[in-house]
Swiss-Prot record:
Cellular compartments annotated: Cytoplasm
EC number: 2.7.7.3, 3.6.1.73
Pathway: Cofactor biosynthesis; coenzyme A biosynthesis
GO annotation terms (biological process): coenzyme A biosynthetic process; nucleotide metabolic process; thiamine metabolic process
Main location: cytoplasm
Protein name: Bifunctional phosphopantetheine adenylyltransferase/NTP phosphatase
Pfam families, A to Z: CTP_transf_like, NTPase_I-T
SUPFAM superfamilies: ITPase-like, Nucleotidylyl transferase
Cofactor binding: number and manner: Binds 1 divalent metal cation per subunit; can use either Mg(2+) or Mn(2+).
Originating species: Thermoplasma acidophilum (strain ATCC 25905 / DSM 1728 / JCM 9062 / NBRC 15155 / AMRC-C165)
Gene name, Swiss-Prot/TrEMBL: coaD
Cofactors, names only: Mg(2+); Mn(2+)
Length: 328
């Protein structure tokens, strides 16, 4: 039985090793299709690392783990996988999974049995983008996925609590980062209700993306819950990355009394309505109304952080959510 895996392997990184180790773990002889220099020159955006160098690095990695392997030069993405009758298993990444389906279509049309496909999950760098040779060659990350250049995160806000919450989350991911504040935006309302909350959070994120790695849009709004017939205050977060992937998350919500809702419907924000009710001039941005209500046991910044975290949950396990990245 033979397991096949293919690639360019320009910079042998954690993602490549996951593919190779999975192939070895099948217990079969492993055939590695290594793309030729000509293929790399035609199809990759980075300078070609010579075949001989890539071959030697790949060989040295494999020989320490198994002697049941061969490395074959291939000149296209499919190699000889569509035609080899002895191949039984193919190991692929999420990016190359569609190609394996095409390979099986060709095999079937050639009267050969389809290959068993083993799809290896994404291997993410610190910044939650997949590790790739392109990123390593560009000096953005190292072969283990550690971020080298600053992770740039844009946010459209004039609220320091939102900036602090974003920075706190990003700091958990990487040590090298830059928060880029965008204050040049205009919203159609200062107090969104219902789906306006989601729309304005999306607008904030879109206007902050620019040339950043991520952009974050956070909006607090009022949503109506039909079962209890009550209104709730929530924070909604939209995250857009440089590849165009969009993820969303929401904080837990707390009920707003009807008399405050009535004040808000007279063209007031939640903060203005609550301040008027208490006869106070201003509410601290970090503490928020929830801080006043709970006597400091909860703060608005906690709810903001919760919405950010929940928007990034999908990025922590993109395979579970069937997400597809399309990095260069």
């Amino acid at each position: 039985m033979i397991t096949v895996v293919g690639g360019t392997f320009s910079k042998l990184h954690k993602g490549h090793k996951a593919l190779l180790n999975t192939a070895i773990d099948t217990g079969n002889e492993v055939v590695i299709g290594l793309t030729s220099d000509e293929y790399v020159k035609k199809n990759k955006v980075y300078p070609a690392i010579p075949y001989s160098v890539r071959y030697r690095t790949l060989y040295n990695y494999m020989i320490k783990r198994t002697n049941k392997f061969r490395i074959r030069q291939i000149d296209d993405r499919n190699g000889n996988a569509p035609y080899e009758k002895d191949y039984e298993v193919i190991v692929v990444s999420p990016e190359t999974y569609p190609r394996s389906l095409k390979i099986n279509e060709i095999r079937i049309s050639n009267g050969l049995p389809p290959l068993k496909i083993i799809r290896v999950p994404y291997v993410l760098a610190q910044d939650l983008f997949p590790i790739s040779s392109t990123r390593i060659i560009n000096g953005e990350i190292d072969t283990n996925g550690k971020r080298i250049t600053p992770l740039k995160v844009g946010i459209s806000t004039r609220n320091e609590a939102k900036i602090q919450a974003v920075e706190k989350f990003v700091r958990r991911l990487v040590k090298n980062y830059q928060i880029v504040k965008n204050e040049n935006y205009n919203l159609k309302t200062q107090q969104p209700f219902g789906e306006e909350t989601m729309e304005l959070a999306t607008q904030r994120a879109m206007e902050a993306l620019k040339d950043n790695d991520y952009s974050v849009g956070i909006e607090s709004g009022i949503i109506y819950e039909s079962f209890s017939k009550k209104y709730y205050d929530v924070h909604y977060c939209v995250v857009i990355d440089r590849f165009g992937n969009v993820t969303r998350g929401m904080s837990s919500g707390f009920e707003i009394p009807d008399h405050i809702v009535d004040r808000m419907k007279r063209d007031r924000t939640f903060s203005e309505a609550y301040s008027g009710y208490l006869n106070v001039q201003e509410i601290d941005q970090s503490e928020g109304i929830i801080g006043k209500i709970s006597e400091g046991k909860l703060r608005r910044i906690d709810l903001i952080e919760e919405s950010i975290r929940n928007a990034f949950i999908l990025r922590l396990d993109p395979d579970f959510y069937d997400s597809t990245y399309t990095p260069p």
